[in-house]
Amino acid sequence: GAGVTGIVMSQDCVDMYNPKVVRSTMGAAYRVPFCYVDDLAEEVKQMKEAGICTYAAHLEGKNSYDEEDYRKASAFLIGNEGNGLRDEVADQAQVYIRIPMKGQVESLNGAVATAILTFEAARQRR
């Protein structure tokens, strides 16, 4: 994998024990710690206070994801493809980043965006 140490999700995210999720993750859902929180914006605030740099994958990101340094403790904030991140969560991010697109594509689904960002972080940490 990409070396992810944990996943924090809002209560309205997918059920990680859903059989389709377990199948699509090939069991990784059981190997990476995860939790659901009631107030994701507050969790992001606590991450920042703990020295974790928070990056929002956002259409308004000025820097491309591959221009940032992820060698330090990092958290990626990923929204769903229909609505993106909720404003109150995105507002807590320290840095807005974008994944450049070609052609008519406006956004990627959350799994694809997460894979791109986490594997870039893993590449930098080698």
Identify the role of each PLM range.
Residues P19-V21, Q46, D66-D69, G110:
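Short secondary-structure transition/capping segments
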Residues G1, M16-A29, D87-R126:
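Structured adenosyl-cofactor binding patch, chiefly the S-adenosyl-L-methionine
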Residues E49-G51, Y70-I78, I116-R126:
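Short flexible/disordered coil segments
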Residues G1-G61:
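RNA substrate-binding interface of SAM-dependent RNA methyltransferases
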